[in-house]
């Protein structure tokens, strides 16, 4: 068994939210194009690694728990907000630097939608999922066991 540190996932949420806020600030004026390439890729690196941990390890581990409430809550949240990795990958592929330059307003609108979805996911996980995961962990270390 390998352990997943819930505190580390929370720290990753903070880092992702900070980069997302910087990107949101950069797109705040749809009439004033900004250099956003570095921010987008920084967010992509952090977010995709984080989502892989959650989607491939945390959610399945919670869905294997003996407690029906834990299993159904994890499954419900994943069904409601679990498609973010695919949506974000499509967003990154669709918005090349050249296309961003040509269609800044469209990029701002699409970025706003993806950042809103990200904020909703982080909020749901921080309010519901992470406390649930901590309730089934070993209590002392903030870790949940996973097969590995």
Please describe what each predicted stretch is.
Residues 1-148:
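Small-residue-biased structural context
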